[in-house]
């Protein structure tokens, strides 16, 4: 059976992740639109997931979703370079469409991970 190579670039889009996060910073209402679509684990870049998680925490605590509060929520996870990249990214209008795309890429990554685990699981010895 031939092994097919998977183009990992189709499984994430860092620009799209940054655009979603930038849109939330510019308008916290965008977070309400995608709150039920995305989780922090859907972001390919762990730092983006951490920022998203901090945004959700701010929303849940009725705090403004802005850099000062995000920095406090992130604590030692705060990365100024990552935050500057997010802030420097243009916001998007249809944040829900982009969130669905990120979710789809996350699901595909999970499927690839499972597919890679199957051969080793199949070849494991079962206890008698």
Describe each model-derived feature in a short phrase:
Residues 113-128:
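Non-catalytic interaction/clamp surfaces of large macromolecular machines
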Residues 1-107:
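Noncatalytic partner-interaction/assembly domains of nucleic-acid and motor enzyme complexes
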């Amino acid at each position: 059976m031939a092994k097919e190579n998977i183009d990992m670039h189709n499984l994430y889009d860092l620009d799209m992740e940054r655009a979603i996060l930038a849109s939330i910073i510019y308008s916290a209402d965008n977070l309400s639109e995608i709150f039920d679509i995305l989780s922090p684990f859907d972001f390919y870049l762990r730092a983006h997931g951490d920022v998203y998680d901090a945004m959700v925490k701010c929303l849940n605590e009725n705090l403004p979703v802005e850099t000062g509060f995000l920095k406090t929520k992130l604590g030692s996870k705060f990365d100024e370079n990552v935050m500057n990249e997010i802030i420097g990214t243009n916001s998007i209008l249809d944040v829900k469409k982009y969130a669905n795309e990120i979710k789809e890429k996350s699901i595909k990554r999970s499927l690839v991970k499972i597919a890679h685990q199957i051969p080793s699981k199949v070849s494991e010895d079962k206890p008698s």
